[in-house]
Amino acid sequence: MKLRNLKIAHFKNLRDFEINFGQQPFTTVLLGQNGTGKSNLLEALIIIFRDLDLGAAPAFSYTLDYECRTYEIHVEADHTRQKRGEQVQIAVTKPDGAREKITYNRFSQDPERSYLPSYVFGYYSGPSNRMEKHFDQHQNRFYQDQLRGEEKPRRQLFYARSVQSQFALLAFFTETEQEEQPGRQSARQFLKDLLGIEKLVSVYFVLHEPPWTSKDGDARFWNARGVLGDFLAHLYDAALAPMRLKKRVVSELGSSTTLEHFHFYLRGEEDLKKVFAHYGNQQEFFKALESTYISKVLSEVRIRLQRSGAEEPLTFSEMSEGEQQLLMVLGLLRFTKEEEALFLLDEPDTHLNPAWSVQYFDFMHQAVGDLPTSHVLMTTHNPLVISSLKREDVRIMQKRKTGVFVELPRENPQGMGVSNILTSELFGLRTTLDLPTQRKLDRQRELTVSDQRTLPEEAEWHRLTQELDDMGFQVGEDDELYNAFIKKWLAREDSDLREHIVLTPEQQRSREQMMEKIIEELVAEGHWR
């Protein structure tokens, strides 16, 4: 699954908008100031694939090109057309180059899902449900399929929630040696090297009587059927002394009721693998674990882990938010490594420490191996995360008077260093210094090249020069070339820009051109020989 190109007529602040993703992307990172529309772009893609999967009328007009299962797919959607059959037009180019137009019904109802990704994952690190709400129809369909006892319930659109980090961790412990691939770090090695997790000590499931009823199914578990019923039966067989208890539960509104609860205790990896033995792969096992949450029977999961150098086991809830965040994203990538999937991640790095931020894309590649079949589109405001990327992996979204535009960086972030990344077009900062220090530098430079300093200004200059020298800055007035450059610079610089935190691309280019012009003048004047 690879996105190629997207044009949007009008969605929120994206009007006459276009973005090209390149030819062979695994990851595409969106940069831009707040309000440029990065999250809106992710939201638009979720809506597009939601509607394509459901065979629904388009919510807005767009043109989308992407590759899926060796097919090149071209979708033209116009929500203003009166006839429903004309609103979405699709052309498919086969591997042999033959191009065929197909109907929307054939496209969305194809039982083999030849033209759509197996999964579209969404993740948003903030508290808003702006992204989550677009997954409601698919989650409800998945929920209803489970209640009906469908053996393979459908769920192509998947919104990642924090509770699923626990399921991802449990699925990591089930990986076998046969599943290891070239270029991909083993699950056990990943847990040990990155998180210091030596082993799984125990897992304690608490499940409660659901709000739904069922006539047929396993009578032990409220007549649960399908994926949920099978999983509860496997859990029951593997657990040490399963317990059924009645417990009074208080609702959010303050009312109380008595519900039946099951308690299942698994003694580490051996018991967990007894449950896993009934599933073909980690993906199916993860789906079974998640069925307890989707079906509203999960009360809690307590996972105890042994960490390197720790005397006492720790619980999953004691892990940091950054660890839980990383487990979920990498787990989903890992479990769908052989599937055609699209990951739409809105700032998935918010809780990562600097060391993990620098390695973020290495972690991703270790999760999927050498031949990724997915496309990860993510937003970030973290310069460390993009420090290893080539320019082709990055898109800068910029807001101008006529709309939002997307550009490729002029240089590779890789090799620039964090300070240069921050002051380049990638983030546009005027300086990486704190503002009080930068203001001291600006004022000291003004005084340095002043032809006539008053006595108070002379005292101010000496004070600032000493303060900056103590901080490690070389700002003396004995450097003739430096002073000549600063004098020309201050004479031409827009003084208002000194109070700007972020510069526009146009302002950055103007300053670069001014700097080049000044250097040419200094060379012509004989300052360089």
Which ranges hold each PLM region?
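Acidic, Mg2+-coordinating catalytic modules of nucleic-acid enzymes
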Residues: 1, 111-121, 127-221, 399-404, ...
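Switch/communication elements of ASCE P-loop NTPase nucleotide-binding domains
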Residues: 1-65, 69-72, 277-288, 293-432
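N-terminal intrinsically disordered, low-complexity tails enriched in polar/charged
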Residues: 1-6, 99-101, 529
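Generic structural motif
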Residues: 11, 24, 69, 95, ...
